[in-house]
Amino acid sequence: MLLLLCVNMSGTQMSAFLRKYLADEDKKIRAQFKESDPNNKLILWMHEKTRITEEDLARPYTEDEVKELCLRTKVKVDMTAWNCLWEAKKRFEAKGRFVNKSERFINRMYMKAVRRKMVQPYPEEFVAQRREIVAAETKKQNISRLDRWQKKKSQNLSAPESSPDAHASSNDAVQSHEDQANTNLSSLSQMNFQVEAMAPPGVSSSDLSGIGDDEDEQQQSGFQDENINRPETEINENSVRCDPINLGRMRTGCINSQANNSFRNTESDPDYYMFGTQLSTLVRPTSTQEPDDQVNCPETEMNESWVRCDQINSESLSIGPSIDSEGTITFQNTESEPIDVTSIA
């Protein structure tokens, strides 16, 4: 019983209004698309295929056709068609009258709009005529569906029965193709979702278009130029090996080019491994005068940069002892008294 209510099984007769309406539509289409123009052949052919005729409306449905239509066709109801309240709703929402309002207030506004004739209900005759047009169009669409489904069934039955595997393989191929297409669409939607989730709050995919522009490329090239122009003699402080002598008193810093130049020029000088008033027996006393190209530090000011532990240049440690021509040991930047070498011996 429910299936019979879904589609009207009996054929219907075309009314005078519907006949006139279809004739007017046909004239409008043929006036717009002339038959003399070869570019309009496809449009006119489609119009002939989709045009509603009296034979279409008079065609009755069988029980199998009604069942198939009810099972394979979705029923759609447009509640906004020829509804004056829907038009009033659009007008009120355009003015913002329903913002943060209760349902009771909204219903009262609908009644007020109809009472003051802001909108008027459609006449019943007009609604009946429009429903007749929609019913005729729906029946034409249902006939096209049934013909298409019947054609597919006849093609499957007309195929040779000796090759059922071929039909199965063809169906599997079509099914796999559809599955692949659905998979591609789903993967594309997932990728778009991840890109948005990764974006910061309040920032859209269009606001990230500035990444990788000329400004960032100039900044990156500036970093590269800075690394290229860096002196070759610069030593990374992490690569300097130091003996554990007064590490707590050392002040970390960067090695400038002047300290590096002094380090190059004094590679042949003796190394002092002990600080204080005693000298290592392995050290040969020589003059510690700096070369001309080396920068001398004042007695009251020391360079805060450091190089190796054997030549520490800091405020808390002396550079190293030296012996003058009279045989007296002195320490630079310290207030210790001179020591006589003869007395030590």
UniProtKB/Swiss-Prot annotation:
UniProt motif (Su(var)205-binding Pro-containing repeat 2) ranges: 298-304
Documented effect of changing residue 273 to F: In strain: Australia 5 and USA 1
Other remarks on this protein: Multiple telomeric associations (TAs) in the same metaphase spread often result in multicentric linear chromosomes that resemble little 'trains' of chromosomes, hence the name 'caravaggio', the name of an Italian train named after the artist.
Deleted gene: phenotype: Death at the larval/pupal boundary due to extensive telomere-telomere fusions in larval brain cells.
Effect of residue 144 to T: In strain: Canton-S
BP GO terms, sorted: telomere capping; telomere maintenance
Entry function: Part of the HipHop-HOAP complex that recruits the MTV complex to form the terminin telomere-capping complex, which binds to chromosome ends in a sequence-independent manner and prevents telomere fusion. Telomere capping is independent of the origin recognition complex (ORC).
Membrane-spanning segments: none
UniProt keyword Signal present: no
Gene Ontology cellular-component annotations: chromosome, centromeric region; chromosome, telomeric region; nucleus; telomere cap complex
Effect of residue 236 to Y: In strain: Japan
A molecular function (GO) term: telomeric DNA binding
Residue span of region Required for binding to Su(var)205: 115-337
Result of altering residue 198 to I: In strain: Australia 5
Residue segments, region Disordered: 145-180, 200-231
Subcellular location as annotated: Nucleus; Chromosome; Chromosome, Telomere
UniProtKB keywords: Chromosome, DNA-binding, Nucleus, Repeat, Telomere
Short sequence motif named Su(var)205-binding Pro-containing repeat 1, residue ranges: 231-237
Subunit-structure text: Component of the HipHop-HOAP telomere capping complex, composed of at least HipHop and cav/HOAP, and may include Su(var)205/HP1; HipHop and cav/HOAP, but not Su(var)205, are interdependent for their protein stability. Interacts with HipHop (via N-terminus). Interacts (via C-terminus) with Su(var)205/HP1 dimer (via hinge and chromoshadow domain) and Orc1; possibly interacts with other components of the origin recognition complex (ORC). Each molecule of cav/HOAP interacts with 2 molecules of Su(var)205/HP1.
Protein name in the entry: Telomere-binding protein cav
The keyword DNA-binding belongs to this UniProt entry's keyword annotation: yes
Gene it is expressed from: cav
